[in-house]
Amino acid sequence: IRRQRQMCIRDSPRTEHESAADQYTYRDGGRPGDRLVEELVRNLGAHLNPRGIAVMLGNWEVHEADDSWHSRLESWAPDDTDLWVVQREQATPIEYADMWLKDAAENRELRNWRQQFARYLDDFAARTVSHIGMGMLLLHATPEGASSVRRFESLEHQLAQPLGAAIRDAFDADDWLRERSDAELLEETFVVAGDVTDERWTIPGEEHPSAMLLRQGGSFRRTFPESTELASFVSVCDGELTGQQIVVAIVALLELDQDALLGAIARDVRDLVAYGFLIPRWM
């Protein structure tokens, strides 16, 4: 695809973190550490058509000096490419080495296993690796002139399958959200996605719930914490009233500051639309 542009690119790169001396070419990407994944994240966007998506599985290193598990990933993506990473699992160097040595049946002979294990750990130590993240890396062509999206989630629970439509819908929602200011966003009407339920956790004897959250039954099966105000807002999202109208009603009912609530609700609504909890009525 060097000189081509695509609407969809799917990849599962050979991303085991091996040293140059390793003989397992079927799983070795030919780059030290996570360099192959870095090159793909940096360059795949150049091969995507407008609204094009690249989907791949990959591993990445988390170094001791990193501020978060996705610090290095953030630095890889160019400004014209949206990057969404879903971390499904995280392993220490010891856990990672043990996994791949068992995959190669290197644990059958103790002396060789110790040598190979030490080689893995020395290689990780040379780059001050504290963990290895594993999961999905999703890239999307950022519309011209728009700010790119950076989304990083750690979701280790079981996800619904297939996810293709949910991924497409999420990037479409990002494009839709980028076109609207907070004020314009709250002039829209919304409906709650069909797989979303509302949960209330109450301590026996207490009048009010101690926790409230929205839960997705499908796609990525996320949860989203709710305040009293947000729960009130979502409960009225039936596609009839605009977000602005709902907020005005909540302000009157709870005697709140309207400007402050508009700002807080707009931030939450952006996240709820991006994650698929709320759907703009026209979509």
Show the residue positions of the predicted features.
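Flexible loop/turn segments at secondary-structure boundaries
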Residues: 12-18, 62-65, 92-95, 146
